[in-house]
Every structure is written in C-alpha cells, then in structure tokens.
Design a protein with these regions (language model features):
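Terminal amphipathic alpha-helical/low-complexity segments used for targeting or macromolecular assembly
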Residues: 1-148
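Short, conserved active-site entrance elements at the starts or edges of catalytic domains
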Residues: 136-166
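Short coil/loop residues immediately preceding or within conserved phosphate-binding loops
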Residues: 153, 173, 211
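Glycine-rich phosphate-binding loop
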Residues: 170-178
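Glycine-rich hexapeptide-repeat left-handed beta-helix
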Residues: 186-265
Length: 265
C-alpha cells in the first residue's frame, strides 16, 4: 500500500525527488515491478490457503478460483495482477476527484497537498479503491486485510465490496462504517460516526452475497452519527440526513430527514 501510494500520488510520498529532469516513467516502472512481485506472491498465498478450505469452497464455489494446483494458482495470481495494474490509471483518476471533493468541501483545507498528505478520509478511500479491485477479482483475504489496516489507522471502516462513485467526501471520519454491499453514488458527503449498515445479521453465512446495506444516490449529505440501515433502503439523490437520524426505509430524492427539535427547559 505504501508503494502504491507513491505511484498514484507521485512526488508526495517516498524519498525520491521528482523534478522536470527526472524520468517519471523510470521511477514508476521500477516501483510497479516491485509491487507486482510482492502482490503476486501474496495472492498466491491467499489462493493456496483458500483452495484448502473445503468448507468455504462448498459454501461459496466462487471462492475456489483455481482448483488448488500450484500451476493454476500461479496462473490465476498472474491474471489478477494483470487486471489490477490495468486498473491503476482509473483508480488514480477517481482518487483525484476524491481529493477535489475533500478540498472543495472543507474550508479548513489549506491546499490539495494538505488533503493528500494528512486527511484520514482520503487515506481510507485510497485503500478501499485499491482493495475493491482485488475484491472484484474474487481474491480472498487480502482485500479485507487492506481495509482493516486502514480501519485501524483512521477509525474508518469501508467494506472492500462496497460500490462507491466519484468525488467521495468523508470529513473527520472517525467511526464511519460502510458495509460490504453498500452502493454510493457520486458527490456524496459523509461526516464522522455515520453508519451505512445492515438491519440484522442473524442469518449469518446464509446472507453472504445478499444485499444487506443501503443505496445512497448522487449528491446526498449524511451528517454525524446518523445510521442508514437495510439492503432495501434507498436515499434519493440530493437528500440530506441530519445528525443522529436513524433511517430504515427509503427516502425520496431531495428530502430532508431531521430529528424532532429538542426541548430547552
């Protein structure tokens, strides 16, 4: 993740001094070779481990990616890496929209450089966007490890399976939870403590693959400590959810969901 961040945000992280006379193609090429080697090794280990997990394979045949033979495991790992690196330009493009959203949405941001260097929300989004590509390729274990690493460092828990659009904004971020099957549109803003979660997980593994988390349409703002729960819950485009609201049913576009005003005595 550290090396990938150096590639996706060249000149911001690492010891290299990128100048007009520096060859960015050489720097990025050498770094990508190292990343590919390390990532492929980790994918091989994850696939080998999962192929031996017969109970998991029976519960979800999609988790058996390669039949378990070393040759097929290595071939599958190489295929995953090819797709992953093909996706890096798109990941970078989307991350730059996230930087723009954070800068535009936070008056305290002094510059985009400040956002890139120091905002925990951007770091959590970055890790999610990388992990999501591996998740889409049915790579076991690694996407979860990545997002939990970001969770432990930022307090922001984004499931690798969530689908999140461009210009995504998380302010402060502590306590934000975004479930695995959440769908989020473009230009969405979340504040600290927001939960986009499931109504109940009593079904356990029977609910694997079932949409359990809400859909948040474009240009929605959800303020601090609000909870939006349930796989059938849709928050319509342009809506605003007030802080500490508890929403378990769909909301039409351009709605305002607020709590009853507190009494002052």
């Amino acid at each position: 993740l550290k090396d990938l961040r150096r590639v996706l945000f060249p000149g911001y992280f690492g010891d290299e001094m990128l100048t007009p006379s520096t060859s960015p193609e050489y720097f990025i090429g050498e770094t990508l070779i190292q990343i590919e080697r390390a990532l492929r090794e980790q994918i091989v280990l994850a696939l080998a481990y999962t192929s031996d997990d017969r109970d998991a394979e029976e519960a979800d045949p999609a988790r058996s990616l390669c039949g378990g033979t070393p040759e097929r495991i290595c071939k599958r790992a190489s295929e995953v890496c090819t797709v992953f690196f093909d996706e890096l330009p798109r990941i970078q493009q989307v991350l730059l929209t996230d930087v723009q959203a954070l800068y535009d949405g936070d008056p305290a941001a002094g510059s985009k450089e400040e956002v890139i260097f120091s905002y925990p929300g951007l770091y959590a989004i970055y890790v999610y966007r990388v992990a999501h590509v591996l998740y889409q390729q049915n790579v076991p274990i690694i996407p979860r490890i990545m997002t939990e690493l970001a969770h432990s460092g930022t307090g922001i828990d984004i499931g690798a399976g969530a689908e999140i659009g461009e210009y995504f904004f998380i302010d402060h971020g502590t306590g934000v939870v975004i479930g695995e099957t959440t769908v989020i549109g473009d230009h969405v803003k979340l504040y600290q403590g927001v939960t986009l979660g499931a109504l109940s997980t009593r079904g356990g593994q029977r609910l694997a693959g079932v949409k359990r988390h809400p859909t948040i349409e474009d240009a929605v703002t959800i303020y601090s400590n609000a909870s939006v729960l349930g796989g059938e819950t849709v928050i319509g485009a342009g809506s605003v959810i007030a802080g500490s609201a508890f929403v378990t049913s769909s909301v039409p576009p351009h709605s305002r969901v607020t709590l009853k005003a507190q009494e002052i005595t």
